[in-house]
Amino acid sequence: MAPSNLPPVFNATSQDIEMLLAAQCHLGSKNLQVHMEPYLWKTRPDGINVINIGKTWEKIVLAARIIAAIDNPADICVISARPYGQRAVLKFAAHTGAVAIAGRFTPGNFTNYITRSFKEPRLIIVTDPRTDSQAIKEASYVNIPVIALCDTDSPTEFVDVAIPTNNKGRHAIGLIWWMLAREVLRLRGTLANRETEWDVVVDLYFYRDPEAEENKEIEETKVPGAEEVGAAAIESGLVGDSWQAQATPGFSAGVAVPGTAVPGWEADVSTDWAASSAPAAETLADPAADPSVKW
């Protein structure tokens, strides 16, 4: 499956072929579109169509030469409505200077000059001809060339350059965009020669689930042991309301009982039971001594 229709300088290395196979770029769908048949290598017994990796590499180089031929990188528009390709097109645009449309393509971007998002690119590159059909349709109205990542079941109408690959897997999509960006930079001279390794790793082009990344950050920021519950926490005396304290020997020492303790009740305790109690502060007057008192 090695490419044979390219000049020796554009030949793929064994590492490139291994990366394409590892990312499963050669695995198509069970359906086959008639115009994608030349890129088919064989059909497996389970019905999966296998794409010729050599043809994939040839089309990557061809697409890179077309992109490098455009003087102004801002005249290139890269589009992906498929979530797995949105991160890849943003990275491709950042590294090559192209304009990225990640997410829903607003109808009229290429045909309605009244809209704020109106663009007049000289070339568009799409991730999936089926999900990005609106962009391809509008490009056909205004004669804009189209480069597309095409699976075995992808429609190729109005597609000028089809890169045969698996356009449904996150790793396959990211790898194709990464290789395309690397070849463009090599042709532009940003990379000194083909032996120079690109310092950008392919992982940056892979799709990442935002919820999974958020949960990962939350797990990393948790305080160790904060989630402990059960026997260990109960034994340590940390479970319960704030008024509960850990039991210790002699805990009742010095604890007053509400409703029974009277301040100073132990003062002036006498052991002589014959002694009379002290008279009250106010005593009754003697009627015989005071004649004014009448009974």
Swiss-Prot record:
Compartment annotation: Cytoplasm
Protein name: Small ribosomal subunit protein uS2
Gene Ontology molecular function terms on file: structural constituent of ribosome
Task of the protein: Required for the assembly and/or stability of the 40S ribosomal subunit. Required for the processing of the 20S rRNA-precursor to mature 18S rRNA in a late step of the maturation of 40S ribosomal subunits.
Subunit structure: Component of the small ribosomal subunit. Mature ribosomes consist of a small (40S) and a large (60S) subunit. The 40S subunit contains about 33 different proteins and 1 molecule of RNA (18S). The 60S subunit contains about 49 different proteins and 3 molecules of RNA (25S, 5.8S and 5S). Interacts with RPS21.
Family: Belongs to the universal ribosomal protein uS2 family.
Keyword tRNA-binding found: no
Gene: RPS0
Aminoacyl-tRNA synthetase recorded as keyword: no
PROSITE patterns in alphabetical order: RIBOSOMAL_S2_2
Keywords of this entry: Cytoplasm, Ribonucleoprotein, Ribosomal protein
Any one GO BP annotation for this protein: translation
Domain of life: Eukaryota
GO cellular component: cytosolic small ribosomal subunit
Database matches in Pfam families: 40S_SA_C, Ribosomal_S2
